[in-house]
Amino acid sequence: MRPVDADEAREPREEPGSPLSPAPRAGRENLASLERERARAHWRARRKLLEIQSLLDAIKSEVEAEERGARAPAPRPRAEAEERVARLCAEAERKAAEAARMGRRIVELHQRIAGCECC
């Protein structure tokens, strides 16, 4: 039996037919999880943008209804409509801020994926 070199003790030799060592496999798994997270963040941001679009459409219809009501002989109480519009605007602003955070997260994930040197 021959003595074990210091290099052999630290690093096991890979055989040509053996499966990948844990380091590259872990790197690929890490990259795959980053890709999945980026895709999830993209779809979350897309959903938020669709919600914002829906809110903006609701605001637009409220404003148009209010304008039609203002021209009609018997106008609706203006305070109620203004309150609804203000509430919808506040919700749209909140959703827009959340969508902006999602966008920043997507950019951050993309930069992490681009900077990953595992593959």
From Swiss-Prot:
InterPro entries: MRFAP1
Bias (Basic and acidic residues) ranges: 1-16
Example GO BP: regulation of cell cycle
Region (Disordered): 1-36
The organism's place on the tree of life at top rank: Eukaryota
Name of a matching Pfam family: MRFAP1
PANTHER family: MORF4 FAMILY ASSOCIATED PROTEIN 1 LIKE 2, MORF4 FAMILY-ASSOCIATED PROTEIN 1-RELATED
Function: May play a role in cell proliferation.
Complexes and interactors: May interact with CDK2AP1.
Family: Belongs to the MORF4 family-associated protein family.
UniProt-recorded name of the protein: MORF4 family associated protein 1 like 2
Gene: MRFAP1L2
